[in-house]
Amino acid sequence: AEVVEPSGRCTAKTTSNEIYAVTMMMADKRNNVWYCRAEKGDIRETIFSSMINTIQLMGLERMFVWSLSPFQITCLQTGAKCYFSGINGKTDDDMTATKGFTPNGNTLALCILDESDQVKHFNHITAWESTAYRFLLPHGKMVYAYNPPMNRHHWAYTFFGDKVKNGASRIYATWRDIYKLLPIKTIQQIEKFAKNDPEYYRYWYLGEPVNFKGMVYPQFNREKQTRDIFEFFAERDRIVELHIGLDEG
């Protein structure tokens, strides 16, 4: 099963995925997890540290051990492992970054691609999927978590949109869904942006594309800045040519 998770910031989608991963690992030795990002160099400071924090948040640090070389977390109760990888190839058509991956026991219960939109090219996701599906258990899940890009023409909108059209589950969340769990200062900051900078708020916290590419400038006022062309015509005049000038930036 595929799960697409496009959401804004402060929605706990990363923590929720990690709690599910920990729960799966503790249930069965076959429930290995493959936790990935675009760049291998980002793993330690992001998903590896985050996963450890979630284990500690759940009070289960005594049930797990972890190592830095390779980046790996093992459940002492079952032996299930969480592997960490960067999936970007060296070029757009380089499909080899995850080619040699093999999990313990040749099984995977959960594959998570965090910040999926940061992958350089969707070819790299396709290559990652081809490896993952070789080991994915019947109950296994492929999870694509990301904050929607500002640019509505980014490849992620089509790529993940097609997945949903083809049957993938879509989970969309905002900060309001975990309102009671957020620190009061975080809520105050969010509400400040909602009031003072609604465009930024929509992008950052609601996960909506708001950049100006393909959009009318927010300063545009139809009443002030459009005129009926026929106001400029003399009687019995007609349009012979229409020239349209566009500026983008």
Where are these regions (language model features)?
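Short beta-strand/turn micro-motifs composed of small residues
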Residues: 37, 113, 146
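Hydrophobic residues in beta-strands of the RecA-like P-loop NTPase core, especially within AAA+ ATPase
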Residues: 108-114, 246
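ASCE P-loop NTPase helicase motor core
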Residues: 118-195
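ATPase catalytic-site recognition across NTP-hydrolyzing enzymes
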Residues: 179-246
